[in-house]
């Protein structure tokens, strides 16, 4: 498993980028199916419930809501899938989904990619290209918030890898 691969520095468009990865002992199609099972993300993303609100959840134009919080206290992250690609059978391209965060708190692009490393191994890459809220306050606060945000996402990725591996080995 790897640690955050970017320093949260501005991307060329002024967004803040955060990329985290985790290696999973399961084939790429298995990992892809698990990370894009939107309703199951609450199993591995702390205090988050995700639901599909439009479309099939596996194509451009589909919409999702993710509520992160405890009880009624939290925030709603609304998203639209803007890119969806899966490699053709026999090819080795990545599985990739890009969502546009359209909510009041989280804005920007989120990217999920699964890359095959071997027949029973893959790498899941989660990138956020964030438009920080609150203008200058958000830009000033990002270096303070980023380490905790990255640690939380990395914990979620490790849990996802464990759960995905367990499911895969139980079905073999």
Task: Set out the residue ranges of the language-model regions.
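Beta-strand elements of well-folded, non-transmembrane domains
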Residues: 26, 70-72, 130-134
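Beta-strand/loop substructures that line and gate deep hydrophobic ligand-binding cavities in soluble
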Residues: 94, 100-155, 171
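N-proximal short alpha-helices
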Residues: 4-8, 14-17, 64, 125-133
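Hydrophobic ligand-binding cavity/cleft-lining segments
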Residues: 1-59
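Glycine-rich portal/gate segments that line the openings of hydrophobic small-molecule binding cavities
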Residues: 23, 42, 52-109, 119, ...
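Conserved beta-strand segments that form the floor/walls of ligand-binding pockets within enzyme
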Residues: 17, 23, 80, 113, ...
């Amino acid at each position: 498993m790897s640690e955050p691969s970017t320093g949260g520095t501005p991307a060329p468009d002024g967004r803040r980028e955060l990329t985290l990865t985790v290696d999973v002992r399961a084939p790429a199609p298995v990992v892809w199916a698990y990370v894009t099972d939107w309703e199951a993300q609450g199993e591995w993303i702390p205090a988050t419930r995700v639901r599909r609100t439009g479309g099939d959840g596996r194509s451009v134009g589909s919409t999702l809501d993710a509520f992160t919080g405890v009880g009624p206290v939290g925030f709603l992250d609304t998203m639209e899938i803007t890119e969806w690609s899966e490699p053709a059978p026999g090819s080795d391209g990545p599985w990739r989904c890009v969502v546009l965060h359209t909510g009041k708190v989280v804005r920007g692009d989120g990217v999920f990619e699964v890359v095959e490393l071997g027949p029973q191994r893959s790498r899941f890459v989660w990138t956020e290209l964030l438009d920080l809220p609150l203008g200058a306050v958000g830009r000033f606060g990002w270096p303070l918030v980023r380490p905790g945000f990255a640690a939380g996402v990395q914990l979620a990725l490790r849990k996802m890898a464990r759960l995905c591996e367990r499911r895969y080995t139980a079905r073999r």
